[in-house]
């Protein structure tokens, strides 16, 4: 509390009355009950940031029952280590300056892209769920290394660094992932043979 100036309350209405930016970070199944509690206290000048898959801007507007400034967002779990990716969609009442401010808040733990709402489900697939796929990929590569005799801890180091380095190459070179893949694949080499197996399977 002393270091960051954080105030804690177990009363949702007290929180709404005290803030200019309200983050609704509860499980989707609790959204309606929380909105019912607070909607009469939400001000027209407040910014509301939501974090809940499936809760559309139109659904939220209906539940609040009045014109409110809402930015719908979808971060992913790498935000826990400051490397997240967040999609953000403002409604028609949010100004350009306000969406810029929201992006500044979100950039504290992730990269941010402002998107149209029709792409939010795509964000869930390509960013929200995909860390699980990457974790499975890392585990599979490490398992293969362990099978060949490498200690588990060392296998994870190799697999994780390969993923981190490869991702950085895509970001920093600007090259198409397919082009970068081709750079690794020597004619008749082991990599292209492995790629062919992955493509078939």
Predicted regions and their residues:
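NAD(P)-dependent Rossmann-like dehydrogenase/reductase catalytic/cofactor-binding core
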Residues: 160-201
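Conserved SAM-binding loop
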Residues: 1
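Short acidic-hydrophobic, aromatic-tinged amphipathic segments that line or gate anion-handling sites
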Residues: 7-12, 113-115
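Short pre-catalytic strand/loop immediately N-terminal to key active-site residues, enriched for Gly-Thr
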Residues: 71, 120-125, 177-182
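Glycine-rich beta-alpha junction loops
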Residues: 53-55, 75-79, 127, 161-163, ...
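Internal alpha-helical scaffold of NAD(P)-dependent oxidoreductase catalytic cores
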Residues: 59-69, 85-123, 135-172
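Rossmann-like NAD(P)(H) cofactor-binding subdomain of soluble oxidoreductases
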Residues: 4, 11-88, 92
